[in-house]
């Protein structure tokens, strides 16, 4: 015991006299280990704490407070009581001691065993004895933390202080300037208000002590380690200012003043804060200031050049309208919403009638914003404005004016449909005839711009149940059909197709009876003689394409789906039978339409089941028949690579959302078809039984191509769906992948094999298959004729395993890295690294339920980039571009935050990649560099000379994409510190003169912006 006592005294003396700061940690460790107690530490510090020299006393308090910060959770209630009284007394000591006393009090404020009443005692002492704003920032922060800790754990005690607590905190905060402390202080004020601490007579004082920071004007210093932004402070202060309506009488005049200032950021902050206020303030709070608020908002919308400020002004007006709409009116109370809307109508309505229409749009936007606040506001504004707009439409003959008026009408109708659903309540009943006359005349006008607005307006009117009569709906659909089939303007046609898709959900029977027959008739029309066809306004091929798009668009209701899907499949059947045009491009277009229909069905299980049960058998039946018939017939169109590629997403989309029962039933039939030629999936009885898609060479060569459809099916099923005969299927796919079939067939087989491997459960089957696969790939890489097939299989299997973190993925990736030095395969292997880290569009992706682990790219980067760098350094000159290309593909797929820490070690390699003659390497490297350039000035400092030289030379590259991206990189450099760029300013400006005359407009556009920014470097205000 005596030995421990002696050791403690020794440690204390070494800390206080010997200035050995590390001794405080040893003392704290002794307390934690129970070697001595905190009170023994106080006793050991006795002579030091009683020393007449303030610095010695400060040193003693520093040691004690450090120990308390480490050991506060071990203190007993009695120890805490003694220490609190001691520390409160120390607050009266010399100012040098105060910071250390506050640290100790912060430690004590975190003690769970703090006796009742001591929190109040501590805060009273702090408020009375400490002039907080004369302290250093860190010590002021300590005071805020003491208050925060007590507010979390001793709320009721603090509330017993009443308004004295609020007044004490006001004194603490008054004059605070440091953003770190302000964030904490704002949070404390918000808690004082929201947790109902007594404000007493100090409401205005509390407002003043916080509102003096509004609006926030803060720019964080470069490389600020604290990471505090202006936005953090804005959000913190805004939460305070809008936390109580008791601030309204003080804050709203300030808001109006700041909205009228010339500082754009102040306007923006004020408008956004007003929006937040409207969720808390009530009618009585706003009443006195409505006129001033409206004047300020109106001025901003009428006069501002900033779209952002205009948008926030309109949002603020809508928030005011919503706020005034929420209050419940007593019979004798003034309706503030009504009077407020009257003011807006009075100031804006007459602008809608001005002949020059200069202020039409600002006025319409203001009126629509006010109407957007509530159903009551919407009813009043639209009842006043819509008759006026209808009148103006008839008075203006110019299409441009009519379009403007119709667009405004559309805006108000959208508000009507949002707030006022029922016909009896929406106020449009007496305007129905005039509205229909206006819109139907617009949709037949000669102006295509007017057509587009009219179509959108018709859509809004027809979506309101019961508003239009059945004959009106028929007329709407007829107009849409006419625009689709006859309109020369493609945008008007697309607007009609989009509107048809929207309205078909609500009026399916009308579309079935009126639009579908015309679409079907035009789709099946035979191509006419070219001389007879010249009189057609819209070429035949465009009409066919439009019909296909429209059929897909309207397939949003199950009853329509049952009509459109057979029409589309029938067209493919006619191609198969050699009827009409046997055009692969048309079949591809139909497949795109079928794909869109499938995507639209995915959230409707009944529609998806119907689609799946009719489309999958039909496509497989037609293609199997085509593959098993004599070659040379027209049906071979269905076996073309581009047609089968277009069918893949159709089947994929039809299978990704299947129910487990339907998926299991289908997979057994499809696998039986491909493995055994079992045609029971098809309803036809005349199908041949000689379907052998895994047999290589001979008459079945075309059948190999259909493995792409098998891939689309089995690789898109959920992982919990069991694939029957999986081992046998994988063996066949593996053999086909390495056989002498066509590139399309062996690529499809490799992808299908990889997709199944990715989802295959861990176990003997997976281990056996992978072992055999690795061996056969090795053999294939040695055999000259099969090397390309082997590398295709290798990259897909590697991708499948990389995504699921399989142990074998590292071995296969190493094999690919080694092949970068292969003279024959090196360039193609380098390109395949892009496939390893990018998202695959057709298989092994999230939509197809692939096994994809989080952050697989980061893991791939960490494990393999060092190997690529090492391989580059040891490779001969001819092989180095392969390593650079592989590296640039990997880096380009990574998020910026992952790349930044690695940039110093990789930058020299990236610069070397810019000198590589391969355009793919150049573009990939530039794309990777662009977002990083402005983030690492210290790293770039060493390389800036070479970087600028290489980027400037690439602005003259033969490849347009390289020229544009190089210019974007040079533009990104302007964000670097000025001192780094000024020595190169004139060099870059001279070099950028050539891209200004580039033959491509996009390059010239980028060059102009880049050169302007370099011109401005170093100029005032830049």
Swiss-Prot record:
- Enumerate the UniProt keywords alphabetically: Cytoplasm, Cytoskeleton, DNA damage, DNA repair, Nucleus, Repeat
Q: Which Pfam families match?
A: MMS19_C (PF12460), MMS19_N (PF14500)
- HEAT repeat placement: 858-896, 900-938, 941-979, 982-1020
Task: Cite the InterPro entries for this sequence.
Answer: ARM-like, ARM-type_fold, MMS19, MMS19_C, MMS19_N
Keyword Repressor annotated: no
UniProt-listed GO biological process terms: DNA repair; protein maturation
Localisation = Nucleus; Cytoplasm, Cytoskeleton, Spindle
Give the family per the record.
Belongs to the MET18/MMS19 family.
Outline what the protein does: Key component of the cytosolic iron-sulfur protein assembly (CIA) complex, a multiprotein complex that mediates the incorporation of iron-sulfur cluster into apoproteins specifically involved in DNA metabolism and genomic integrity. In the CIA complex, MMS19 acts as an adapter between early-acting CIA components and a subset of cellular target iron-sulfur proteins.
Q: Whom does it interact with, and what assembly results?
A: Component of the CIA complex.
Instruction: Please report the name of this protein according to its UniProt entry.
Output: MMS19 nucleotide excision repair protein homolog
Q: Which gene encodes it?
A: mms19
